[in-house]
Amino acid sequence: MKYRAYRNTDLRVSEVGLGLWTVSTGWWGDFSDEQAVALMQKAFDLGITLYDAADTYGNGRSEELISKAFRNLRDQIVVATKIGYDFVHHGNERRGQREIPQDFSPDA
């Protein structure tokens, strides 16, 4: 595995990351927590240190899986997470459907 330094830090991030959308949402088949954690731990064993998550991936499930898989390894992984789609108020709409209205103003 190749790694890169992350700007002005001591972090070494794998060039390949593992996105957790597919194991968190159930849109491409169901993954039990045990299956998802095993996959994530295998990726780590193969050198992957970057994991892509979001609060909307399975309504927070991706971040819960990270906790289960890497409870004692937190200082050895990098989590890229994000916010944006509001599934709480707009249901579990998928990309490709009509755009969900967003309001990123300070008053929102």
Residue ranges and their predicted role:
Residues 1-81, 85-93:
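N-terminal binding-site loop/beta-alpha segment at the start of enzyme catalytic domains
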Residues 91-108:
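Glycine/proline-rich, positively charged
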